[in-house]
Design a protein with these regions (language model features):
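Pepsin/retropepsin-fold aspartyl endopeptidases
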Residues: 1-137
Length: 137
């Protein structure tokens, strides 16, 4: 298993995003990405990415197939239905497909959260360090 820190950069090649800061959260079941203006049309979803710190991320409109809809308990403890997309995430040396929920994370420090379902049997999290994978690049 690859060792990662509690904060890492990830690549989302299908969205054209690279070196995006992500919180690694073993307490969260699923992964999520910050977006808004989520519009569902049939089995497709269109959403707008926002992060003024990351120029390639800010104001980017994306349309993808819906992977699933599921109820998720948010950080404030409320349960809400979310739309999930399925795209590859590169974390460290490896790339794996992941289901990622679309969520407004504007009050969160990091635009992406990587949950334990993605990390299970692949990564070991060292919570005393961050950006471990960057050092190996």
């Amino acid at each position: 298993m690859e060792v990662i820190g509690y904060i890492e950069t990830v690549d989302l090649p299908e969205l054209g995003l690279f070196d995006l800061d992500a919180k690694i959260d073993t307490g969260a079941d699923s992964s999520s990405i910050h977006c808004d203006e989520i519009i569902v049309e049939g089995d497709m979803v269109t959403f707008l990415l926002h992060d003024e710190v990351h120029p390639a991320y800010h104001g980017k409109k994306i349309t993808l197939p819906i992977a699933k809809r599921s109820r998720v308990k948010s950080s404030n403890g409320k349960s809400e239905e979310r739309i999930f997309i399925k795209i590859p995430i590169k974390l460290g040396c490896k790339t794996y497909d992941a289901e990622i929920s679309l969520s407004n994370r504007e009050n969160m420090k990091y635009p992406m959260l990587v949950g334990r379902r993605f990390m299970s049997h692949r990564y070991l999290v060292d919570v005393s360090h961050k950006y471990i994978t960057k050092k190996g690049k």
